[in-house]
């Protein structure tokens, strides 16, 4: 045992003295700090701008759009005038032209209001929809009689009355917005609540979901504005609850399977916890964009890349380089058996990989604290059986690093197996790095999900690596809560992937042992 431990320490010494080790670990640390600084600069620039108002460039763009619409409007009016003067009696064309006229006049009124009140229409302001509804309703009322000449008088008057009532409500909200933005948002939500309650075509359960959604918006009304992320989250929560109520997939209108229902229940629990716990509403700036989860994900991706490359190079040369230099013979003639020599090399590489991951974790935490301490550190929120739970930010980050270590270990063992079988450093390192980059490309592009629907995809190694999203399916506050993240690329379950990786590692380790023990070393 003492001799084995001595061999293990000797292997550790060899690894630590390699110049590539120092270089790649240094590059990893520098890259994390550099990426952090760039992200910090971008955030500071973002926070220095008021995206609810327009700058001079935006204003000029809107004015140019308005002029273009006015020119188009004049052309349409000329065509309508020609039809009404008897130059063209095509009533179908006249009907289409009046509808175009409504749309263009509505757009001009909409742009006028935005320019007059300096509102940025390119942001997701709730007031934007009110502005647009009012503008188009005003144009519709103006030309309603021309477009709907075939209507019965009572039906016509009822429709006009309904449109005017809606337009008057929108106008009240717009006028209130100039005086008190928070009060305007509450008034807007009150009108929506009244419409929901008076709608006899929806069920009581559906109405409750919609009313609850409005109540959340009212609760998180910050001076008349709701953050984009929060608003999207509330809308996504409402959409998921409606899907669950109707037992229907939101994507393709098919009935939900049992597993999909369970997943949807957990998603709803996570979304409600994020919103109702106030994760979006703290005193830290820009906290609603999930800065902590975004930057940690970026840090782990970049640093994990360098750790993987480092371990591939070290493992890919651990046997082949010693065979080529002849230094392996001094180990072979020692009293230790070959399987113990190979085991010592695996343990030394594994220890060094863990050491690199610890450096990676420390670097990430220190950089995050140094550059982003003013931003909210949100815990990971998960759910089991419809009940949400929290996981400490630092523990969650540590677990993410360890999960990244699974990928590192798989590629490390692959490189070591090739080094043992081929006894060629260039081949083992080159093939392993090519496989590593191929896996990154395939996983990031979700290629396996889209190229085929066959079961064979489950048995491709790349479909079972990169397990962060399988261990923590709600790891990104921004993406999950905004509805942009939907686990699209997951074609295997966590349990299947873990079993697959275990079998794969056993095969690679066995192949390496067999090759090292039974082949002659010249």
Residue ranges of predicted features:
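Residue-level recognition of pore/gate-forming positions within transmembrane alpha-helices
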Residues: 28-32, 349, 433-437, 505
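Aromatic- and glycine-rich beta-strand/loop motifs that create alpha-glucan
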Residues: 1-28, 343
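Junction motif at the cytosolic side of a transmembrane helix
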Residues: 18, 421, 499-522
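Transmembrane helix boundary and interhelical loop/hinge segments in multi-pass membrane proteins
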Residues: 315-332
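Transmembrane helix segments
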Residues: 37-41, 425-470
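Hydrophobic/aromatic residues in alpha-helical transmembrane segments
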Residues: 311-315, 328, 363, 414, ...
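Secretory targeting signals
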Residues: 30-93, 100, 104-107, 111, ...
């Amino acid at each position: 045992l003492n001799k084995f431990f001595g061999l293990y320490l000797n292997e550790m010494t060899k690894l630590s003295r390699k110049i590539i080790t120092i270089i790649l670990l240094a590059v990893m640390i520098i890259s994390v700090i550099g990426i952090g600084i760039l992200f910090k600069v971008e955030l500071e620039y973002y926070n220095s701008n008021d995206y609810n108002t327009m700058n001079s460039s935006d204003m000029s763009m809107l004015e140019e759009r308005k002029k273009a619409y006015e020119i188009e409007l004049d052309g349409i009016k000329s065509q309508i005038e020609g039809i009404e003067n008897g130059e063209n009696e095509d009533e179908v064309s006249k009907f289409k032209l009046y509808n175009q006229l409504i749309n263009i006049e509505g757009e001009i009124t909409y742009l006028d209001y935005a320019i007059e009140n300096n509102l940025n229409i390119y942001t997701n302001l709730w007031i934007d929809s009110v502005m647009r509804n009012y503008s188009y309703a005003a144009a519709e009322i103006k030309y309603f009689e021309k477009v709907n000449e075939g209507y019965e008088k009572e039906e016509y008057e009822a429709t006009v009355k309904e449109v005017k009532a809606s337009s008057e409500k929108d106008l009240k909200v717009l006028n209130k917005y100039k005086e008190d933005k928070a009060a305007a948002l509450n008034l807007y939500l009150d009108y929506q609540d009244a419409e929901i309650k008076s709608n006899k075509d929806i069920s009581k359960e559906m109405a409750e979901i919609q009313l609850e959604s409005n109540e959340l918006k009212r609760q998180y009304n910050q001076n008349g504005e709701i953050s984009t992320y929060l608003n999207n989250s509330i809308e996504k929560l409402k959409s998921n609850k409606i899907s669950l109520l109707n037992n229907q997939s939101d994507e393709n209108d098919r009935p939900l399977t049992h597993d999909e229902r369970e997943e949807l229940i957990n998603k709803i629990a996570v979304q409600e916890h994020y919103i109702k716990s106030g994760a979006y509403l703290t005193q830290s700036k820009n906290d609603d964009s999930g800065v902590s989860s975004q930057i940690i994900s970026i840090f782990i991706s970049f640093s994990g890349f360098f750790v993987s490359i480092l371990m591939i190079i070290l493992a890919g040369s651990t046997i082949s380089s010693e065979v080529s230099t002849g230094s392996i013979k001094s180990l072979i003639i020692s009293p230790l058996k070959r399987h113990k020599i190979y085991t010592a090399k695996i343990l030394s590489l594994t220890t060094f990989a863990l050491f690199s991951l610890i450096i990676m974790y420390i670097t990430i935490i220190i950089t995050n604290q140094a550059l982003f301490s003013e931003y909210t550190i949100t815990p990971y929120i998960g759910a089991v059986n419809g009940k949400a739970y929290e996981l400490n930010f630092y523990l969650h980050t540590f677990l993410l690093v360890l999960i990244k270590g699974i990928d590192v270990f798989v590629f490390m063992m692959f490189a070591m197996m090739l080094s043992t079988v081929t006894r060629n450093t260039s081949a083992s390192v080159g093939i392993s790095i090519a496989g590593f980059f191929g896996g990154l490309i395939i996983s990031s592009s979700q290629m396996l999900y889209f190229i085929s629907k066959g079961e064979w995809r489950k048995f491709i190694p790349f479909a079972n690596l990169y397990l962060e999203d399988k261990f923590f399916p709600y790891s990104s506050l921004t993406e999950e809560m905004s509805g942009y993240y939907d686990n699209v690329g997951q074609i295997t379950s966590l349990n299947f992937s873990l079993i697959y990786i275990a079998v794969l590692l056993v095969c690679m380790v066995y192949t390496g042992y067999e090759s090292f023990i039974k082949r002659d070393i010249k």
